[in-house]
Amino acid sequence: MSKHADTHQRILEAAWNLFTEQGFNDTSTRQISAASNIAVGTLFNHFSDKVAILEACLDDKFNDVLERAKETDIHRPARLKINHYAQYFYQFYCLHHRFYKVLFSQRLFSQPFQQQHMELIQSLVFADQPQFNKVKAAILLDCYFMTLLYGLGAETPNTKLMLRTLSQKVSVF
């Protein structure tokens, strides 16, 4: 691993430990740089701000969940595929809901952020569909994301309730 990659990884590990111990708001970039044994300036050579660090931490963890979900994906119809991935993703989002509330509050209206998430779900759910209906795909994606946002907005997010809600919504397809 290169020195740059090693430093990047140390930042992510230190930040994740601090975020989980102290919370996002009570963790400063100075604390992250100190825990990483680097200068604050070096931290900002790797990340633009604290939210970018959080996003990278969550992306790392999310990618592990994504791989597990892909390994067990045997579903064909889009409505079953979206439920399959939602089982994994909603559980992960609920487990880390404090952090996703912060991330979504900062990035939700960012076009690149929206596009990245829409493309991921679209590629997972519709990649092997014999006929791709753009309107149907958009509606399924809307159901997925609105259920996610509504569920994470609850005081105590409930994965089972979110999955049941999504299943009811997509059952019309």
Language model feature labels by segment:
Residues M1-Q22, D26-I38, A52:
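Basic, helix-initiating cap at the start of DNA-binding domains
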Residues S36-F47:
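Short hydrophobic/aromatic patch on the recognition helix
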Residues V51-I53, R98:
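A secondary-structure capping/hinge motif
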Residues C57-H84:
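Amphipathic alpha-helical linker/stalk segments
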Residues E71, Q87-C94, S105-L108, D128, ...:
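Helix-loop "lid/cap" segments that line or gate small-molecule binding pockets
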Residues H84-Q115, A138, M146-Y150:
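Amphipathic alpha-helical segments used for helix-helix packing
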Residues R107-A138, L161-R164:
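Amphipathic alpha-helical packing segments from all-alpha helical-bundle domains
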Residues F132-V172:
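Hydrophobic alpha-helical segments that form the core
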